Amino acid sequence: MLERLNFIENKYEELSNKISDPSVMANQKEWQKLCKEHADLEIIVNTYREYKKAQEDLESDKEMLKEESDKELREMAQEEIKELTLKLEDLERELTILLLPKDPNDDKDVFIEIRAGAGGEEAALFASNLLRMYTRYAERKNWKVETMSLNATDIGGFKEVTVAIKGKGAYSRLKYESGVHRVQRVPDTESSGRIHTSTATVAVLPEVDDVDININANDLRIDVYRASGHGGQCVNTTDSAVRITHLPTGLVVTCQDEKSQLKNKEKAMKVLKARLFEAAEAERAASIAEDRKSQVGTGDRSERIRTYNYPQGRITDHRIGLTLYKLETFLDGDIDEVIEALVTEDQAEKMKDLGRVN
């Protein structure tokens, strides 16, 4: 590990020199790429330097303990040695985590697709609850939320809705939300007070650049039609809504949120690229580790990941067996406690994998 950390520190110094070079700064695209690489290494280098300083201090205290005869000074040195030993253990764990393979999509913006599952109108209302939860979470993070497409019901639910969430680290936090979310509650329309179970499916897709995926224009069928609102009524007198079908895969994306046909097409293409990228990534991951299923979950949208129980005020994440009794604040976007637990479990799984490889 130390050999790798020394290499990273040297690389960081090289990048520091490059990004301050006027000739490199003249090429803005290359300069921004180097700045990002420099920023990605900074936390590792700073932690490593703190680790080396603690090691030096520890050796110094050990030397002093050998030579010092004063009782009080020896006691101080022994106490410092204990503290520094614990600090080094913590820093070593932190460095191990920092050196884990990073998901290349972690820094990307995301699309979140929410679809009502089993449960009819109640499932559609739950889909709207989930949309609000992610919107409130994004607000807490100062991320931007943009509606891409929606299919609303007459009573305020969503058969399906897609939003873009833009902000630093959006995918790294939200990627754990892919899967089936289950709600248990008494619907407003239920006169007998029986608890119903409904579901909604969430898919979290990283937004991809043109360089990440290439789409042949001949593989697309693009249809335009008039946008409709709640209950199907027409809300636009022009054919501004867009439906794009990717013929080789059968994937269909619609967008009618904008008044401009061109803007709707641009939005739909972004979502289509994200879906195709996700499909390619899933196929690649399956070929690399066909039988491996992380305890954190596969990210498969068919996997049941969480239950929201209203009568008990309970949320249970089934992937890690975590139960919290804070349903109201959770649905108001206070979801970091669960996400942190999922991140920790994911890191533990990756460390196990590294141990098996090594």
Curated annotation (Swiss-Prot):
Record-linked Pfam families: PCRF (PF03462), RF-1 (PF00472)
A GO term for molecular function: translation release factor activity, codon specific
Keyword entries, A-Z: Cytoplasm, Methylation, Protein biosynthesis
Assigned GO CC terms: cytoplasm
N5-methylglutamine PTM positions: 233
PROSITE patterns according to UniProt: RF_PROK_I (PS00745)
Chief location: cytoplasm
Tagged with keyword NAD: no
The UniProt record lists the keyword Nuclease: no
Stretches that traverse the bilayer: none
Gene3D superfamilies: 3.30.160.20, 3.30.70.1660, 6.10.140.1950
Cell location: Cytoplasm
Post-translational changes noted in the entry: Methylated by PrmC. Methylation increases the termination efficiency of RF1.
Organism superkingdom: Bacteria
Family: Belongs to the prokaryotic/mitochondrial release factor family.
Function: Peptide chain release factor 1 directs the termination of translation in response to the peptide chain termination codons UAG and UAA.
Protein name (database record): Peptide chain release factor 1
Protein species of origin: Clostridium botulinum (strain Langeland / NCTC 10281 / Type F)
